[in-house]
């Protein structure tokens, strides 16, 4: 089973677009897009991971 991952190396960003491309985090929370998710990953010091693409 391949691990699903997102490259968050360019984050955090001060503002995210309103683009809707949901991702489900390991915290079982749906993030609206990669930017919102990656900002949360940075805030969590890397403890938050991607569960899967799409809504939780």
From Swiss-Prot:
Domain of life of the source: Eukaryota
Keyword Disulfide bond (UniProt): yes
Localization terms from the record: Secreted
Cystine bridges: 8-38, 16-35, 24-56
Residues the record marks as carrying a glycan: 45
Domain Kazal-like: 6-56
PROSITE patterns xref list: KAZAL_1 (PS00282), KAZAL_2 (PS51465)
GO MF term list: serine-type endopeptidase inhibitor activity
GO cellular component terms, semicolon-separated: extracellular space
Database matches in InterPro entries: Bifunctional_prot_inhibitor, Kazal_dom, Kazal_dom_sf, Prot_inh_Kazal-m
Pfam families: Kazal_1 (PF00050)
Site (Reactive bond 3) location in chain: 18-19
Keywords: Disulfide bond, Glycoprotein, Protease inhibitor, Repeat, Secreted, Serine protease inhibitor
PANTHER family xref list: OVOMUCOID-LIKE-RELATED, SERINE PEPTIDASE INHIBITOR, KAZAL TYPE 2, TANDEM DUPLICATE 1-RELATED
Recorded domain comment: Avian ovomucoid consists of three homologous, tandem Kazal family inhibitory domains.
Protein name per UniProt: Ovomucoid
Source species: Afropavo congensis
């Amino acid at each position: 089973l391949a691990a699903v991952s997102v490259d968050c190396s360019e984050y955090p960003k001060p503002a995210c677009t309103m683009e809707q491309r949901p991702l489900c985090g390991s915290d079982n929370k749906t993030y609206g897009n990669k930017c919102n998710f990656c900002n949360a990953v940075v805030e969590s010091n890397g403890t938050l991971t991607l569960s899967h693409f799409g809504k939780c």
